A protein has these predicted regions:
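Enzymes and membrane/adaptor proteins characterized by extended Gly/Ser/Thr/Asp/Glu-rich
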Residues: 29-33, 37-42, 52-135
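Short, flexible, glycine/charge-rich loop motifs used to bind or transfer phosphoryl groups or to couple energy/partner
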Residues: 12, 51-52
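Short, charged beta->alpha transition segments
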Residues: 46-50
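Boundary/entry segment of secreted carbohydrate-active catalytic domains
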Residues: 2-45
């Protein structure tokens, strides 16, 4: 007997639901195989990855500093990623995230992107503000 929710009918297949739970790291991409020595930054979406995003209904990606060379290039890459997702059977957009922790870890150049305070400084406000910044 298949598992079913009594609250909502599933709209997507199990495979689509699993794909939506995946967030892939595309920091580097090498055309020929999975080499541990691959250090070619992925700054534009290769056809192989575009096909995989569409075929497997991937839910999201995480970008790193290697993926972001300029604002224009990052916009183009994001557009390529969303175009690939639009060709999936679910037609859902990707959740695009970036490894931007604040503080010393700043993947986006501070001169072209809004800089946010780090988690440590938010935590330091607990005594005065409690958990109001946690929501």
């Amino acid at each position: 007997m298949p598992l079913q929710s009594s609250f909502a009918k599933p709209v997507f297949s199990l495979e689509q639901q699993l794909g939506q739970k995946l967030i892939l790291d595309f920091r580097y991409f090498c055309q020929h195989g999975a080499s541990s020595k691959c250090r070619i930054p992925m700054t534009e979406l290769p056809n192989e990855l575009s096909t995989a995003i569409a075929k497997y209904d991937i839910g999201g990606v995480i970008l790193f500093s290697e993926n972001t060379q300029s604002i224009e290039q990052t916009i183009t890459l994001n557009s390529q990623l969303q175009t690939a997702a639009s060709r999936s059977s679910s037609k859902l957009p990707l959740f695009i995230s970036i490894d931007q922790e604040g503080g010393r870890v700043a993947r986006l150049p501070r001169d072209v992107a809004t800089s946010f305070t780090g988690n440590m400084s938010i935590g330091a406000t607990y005594k005065k503000h409690g958990t109001s910044f946690a929501t």
